[in-house]
């Protein structure tokens, strides 16, 4: 691998981030999060499978550490009892590159069967997909080509998903007036904990 190879990979990923579609849907997503979590006392529940699931898990921990209670619900485990954690005041933040992930489609139906019409924020490459049709707010990734030499391994897609999640986190922090003191209460240990105090 040469420095040109490395530069090319980085540039392709950076270009994908620059081409994430920007719309008022982001503000709508933040409004939903603030309404259901900070005004109605609900929880932001994230979900995804495979690499997208890892991104969803990271989103949950980042939201939680910045003042928005959240947790990751594994779609498979949801079918074996974990679904019971969902309450009527909660909302779902789902991550699926294809927008067709069977386990997430099933999770949506199961959640609705339990608590009714639960709001759904979806991050996907396909705004016309089955999951997108079920979503309250759909945030498209721009469907970037994977930088992987096979064009298959989730690489560029997970990068843009992460960035979209960061936009939602920061937007929510701004809306709720999250401060350094608030951060310190939730992040006592490590370098960031000491830096925030």
Where are these regions (language model features)?
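Glycine-rich phosphate-binding loops that contact phosphosugars or nucleotide phosphates
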Residues: 34, 43-176
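Residue-level signal for alpha-helical context at structural boundaries
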Residues: 31, 81, 186-187
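An N-terminal, well-structured beta->alpha segment
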Residues: 1-39
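Internal, active-site/partner-interface "lid" segment
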Residues: 133, 147, 174-197
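Glycine-rich phosphate/diphosphate-binding loops and the adjacent beta-loop-alpha structural elements
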Residues: 38-45, 49, 189-197
């Amino acid at each position: 691998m040469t420095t040109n190879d490395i530069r090319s990979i980085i540039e392709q990923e950076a270009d994908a981030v620059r081409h994430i579609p920007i719309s008022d849907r982001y503000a709508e997503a933040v409004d939903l999060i603030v309404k259901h979590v900070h005004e109605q006392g609900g929880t932001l529940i994230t979900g995804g499978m495979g690499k997208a699931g890892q991104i969803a898990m990271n989103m949950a921990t980042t939201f939680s550490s910045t003042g928005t209670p959240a947790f990751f619900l594994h779609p498979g485990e949801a079918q074996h009892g974990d679904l019971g954690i969902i309450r009527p005041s909660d909302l779902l933040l789902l991550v699926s590159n294809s927008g067709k992930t069977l386990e997430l489609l099933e999770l949506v139906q199961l959640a609705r069967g339990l608590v009714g019409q639960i709001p759904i924020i979806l991050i996907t490459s396909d705004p016309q997909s089955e999951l997108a049709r079920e979503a309250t707010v759909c945030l498209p990734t721009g469907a970037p080509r994977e930088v992987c030499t096979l064009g298959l391994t989730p690489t560029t897609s997970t990068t843009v998903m992460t960035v979209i999640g960061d936009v939602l986190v920061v937007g929510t922090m701004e809306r709720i007036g999250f401060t350094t003191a608030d951060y310190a209460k939730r992040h006592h240990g490590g370098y960031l904990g000491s830096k925030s105090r």
